Amino acid sequence: MAYTNLNPEKALIWRITHRRNLPWILVNGLHAGNSTARSPDWVTIGNQELINRRAHRAVPLPPGGMLNDYVPFYFTPFSPMLYNIYTGRGGVARVANADIVILVSSLHRVVELGLPYVFTDRHAYTMTANYYNDPINLNAIDWPLLQQRNFQRDPNDPEKVERYQAEALVHGQMPIEALLGAVCYTPQVQQELQEQAARLGVQLDIHSIPQWYF
């Protein structure tokens, strides 16, 4: 199955978070890893070692800084990190699918709002990553690979997994109005999140799409 909605015309970008973080995000937006704005009850998911290492990788284009000065997104919802969180692969702490929310925006929406950003053609932490800050370069991303939802290692294409993890990086903070929606695992979680958004007076499309999970 080809996920043809993953393309440069839409330039959809995706980020996962723990569902317990969503009420805070709905009020405060998304913040970079180095931000002092953080919920005291924030639940961190993913590879903590890699998160820490990103504090020391410089971004070579304006607005510059380090990777943890940015809110990172992938150009696919089907990320290796989501798989690792589900399976515990690589020593990553496991989190149940029902506790993971996939947030969606678009690089075009980021541009429309005038938010500072860069994007890469592969995992941003790699030394071979190429950086861009103009949507005209979106074709540098391997969209056919993303559409295949296939990040298995291939000895004939050793950089495949890195290209699959191309990133969009929004500098500093991303307001809630930059989000296009959110995806969760079950209708029960969907109802819970919709009620949270309604109580906070936030309009956000929230859908239950279990087939997007591993």
Where are these regions (language model features)?
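Active-site-proximal loop/hinge segments that shape catalytic or ion-binding/gating pockets
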Residues: 1-75, 79-214
